[in-house]
Amino acid sequence: RSIRRGYQKSGFLWLKTLRENGFGGILADDMGLGKTLQVISLLLSEQESAKAGEWEWHRSLIVCPASLVYNWQKEISRFAPQIKTTLVTGLATERQRIVRHTKEGEVLITSYDLLKRDVELYRDMVFAIQVIDEAQYIKNPGTQAAKGVKQITAGFKLALTGTPIENRLSELWSIF
């Protein structure tokens, strides 16, 4: 594992505990403290547990602002190259082909804007883990992006944010 700091290990273990007990969660801390690394460690741990026969591993989905899609792929490749990532980007026909041909165990990465357009593509899919990065992006529960995120079926849902509540408590509720 690439977790180097004690608080990162604590965060990773907390995420595992949430996952194992059927809870979702919000990992909220200041920028640069390693939320991405903790999530990558969780994905890798889940994949390794599945290979050991502890449970079935499905695909996972990371939803983030468009500006972070390639960063997620780069970070996963850097810290856990054994995890196959697939970007769900491009024209609608390309995205449709990508989603239809994804394999179990892959991590799909897409943006909020593309998810809200493509939500029908994901309707019959089950994900092991759904991560929403920069979760404050969906602080308004009435937006198409927020509705799209909530339509995804996943065993474990995790929100990452540096600003969980900016103005109203309802912003926190709208995340999940």
Positions of predicted regions on the chain:
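ASCE P-loop NTPase motor core, strongest for the SF2 helicase catalytic module
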Residues: 1-176
